[in-house]
Amino acid sequence: MASQPPPPPKPWETRRIPGAGPGPGPGPTFQSADLGPTLLTRPGQPTLTRVPPPILPRPSQQTGGNNVNTFRPAYSSFSSGYGAYGNAFYGSYSPYSYGYNGLGFNRLRVDDLPPSRFVQQAEESSRGAFQSIESIVHAFASVSMMMDATFSAVYNSFRAVLDVANHFSRLKIHFTKVFSAFALVRTIRYLYRRLQWMMGLRRGSENEDLWAESEGTVACLGAEDQANNSAKSWPIFLFFAVILGGPYLIWKLLSTHSDEVTDSTNWANGEDDHVVARAEYDFAAVSDEEISFRAGDMLNLALKEQQPKVRGWLLASLDGQTTGLIPANYVKILGKRRGRKTVESSTMPKQQQSFTNPTSVKGVTTTNSLEEQEAAFESVFVETNKVAGTPDSTGKNGDKQDL
C-alpha cells in the first residue's frame, strides 16, 4: 500500500516571521493591512483609566418634576388648581380635537400617496400661526375656568353664610325655650309668695320686695360701672407695649436666627466637629446647590444630624466657606475629626499647668507645640464602626461608615 501524504500544517503550527509576505509559507496572512508594525511592537501594558461610578438622581430630580407640554407651559396649572370644582362641561369639551392630528388636519390619503410639496410647505408655514391661535384659545379657556372656579367659591361662601344664619335662628329658638322655662319658674315663685301672703305666713307687701330687688340691681349696676371706668386705661398700656415690645421681639428673633446659622456652618471651617473625606474621582457641579472638586481633595462633611434628607448626596465644604452637596459614591470617608474649639478647650488646662514653670517652658515650646499638633492630628480620626481584621473605614460588605 502506498503511504498517505502527511496532512498540511495548521495555521498555529507554522512559525510566523514578522514582515513576511502572504502565501502558504510563514507569514502573517491573518493580519490586517491597517495594523502597522508599531501597533504590535508597542512596549508596555495598556493604560486602564478609572471610570467614575454613576451619579444618583440629583435633589431637584428626586423632588419630582412636571412634564409640561411645549405649547402649553402657562396653562397646565389651572387643571390642578380648579379641579376641585369639577365641571362636566370642561371635562368633556376638547376644543382642539376637531379631527386635527398634530396640526396636520388628519388628511385622507388616497392609495397611501405622499402629500405634495406644496401641501407640506403650506403646513410648515402655517404651523406657527395655528400654534399662536391655540395659545390664545388656551388663555381664554383658562380665564373661563378661573371665572367658573371663582363663581363656585363665591356661591359656596354665600351658602356657608346662609347656613350660619340658619344655625343662629335655631339657636334663638332654643334660647327662647330656655327663657320661657325661666318665666315659668318666676310665675310659680310669684304664686307661692302670693299664697304665703294671703295665708299670713309672709309679712310685708309685694311692693317692698320689688323695691328691695330694685335696690340690689342698682347697686350691682353701679359697681359694674365703676369697674368699667377703672379698666379703661388698659388699652393705652397695651398700645405702648405693642409699639415698644414688637421691634424688640423682632430684633431678638433675628439675632437668634443669625447665631443659629453661624453655629450650624462652623463645621465647614473646622471650628466644630466634622467628618473628613477624600475625593476619589473628579466631579463638576451643575447647579448652585453642588460644589466641584478633583480627585485627592480633602473635604469636610457635616455630621449626620446636619445632613439633608437626600439619598446618595452629602453636605460638604471644600474651602471652609462654601457649602454644597456632593455625590456620596465619589468620596471615601476617613473618619470623624474633633473641632478646634473642642481641642482648644481640652488643651487649656495643660497650658495653664505649663505656665506655672516659665523657665522650663522656654526651651521646649517648639517641641510641645509639634507634639500637640501630631497628637491632635492622630486623635482626629475616630472609627465609628470597628470591624475585626479590616484596617480601612469600610466594613466587610464594602459599605462606608454611616455619618
Curated annotation (Swiss-Prot):
The gene is Pex13. It holds the Pfam family SH3_9. Residues 1-134, 193-233 are peroxisomal matrix. The keyword Aminoacyl-tRNA synthetase does not apply. The lineage of its organism: Eukaryota, Metazoa, Chordata, Craniata, Vertebrata. The chain crosses the membrane at residues 135-155, 175-192, 234-254. This is Peroxisomal membrane protein PEX13. Keywords: Membrane, Peroxisome, Phosphoprotein, Protein transport, SH3 domain, Translocation, Transmembrane, Transmembrane helix, Transport. Its main location: membrane. Component of the PEX13-PEX14 docking complex, a translocon channel that specifically mediates the import of peroxisomal cargo proteins bound to PEX5 receptor. The PEX13-PEX14 docking complex forms a large import pore which can be opened to a diameter of about 9 nm. Mechanistically, PEX5 receptor along with cargo proteins associates with the PEX14 subunit of the PEX13-PEX14 docking complex in the cytosol, leading to the insertion of the receptor into the organelle membrane with the concomitant translocation of the cargo into the peroxisome matrix.
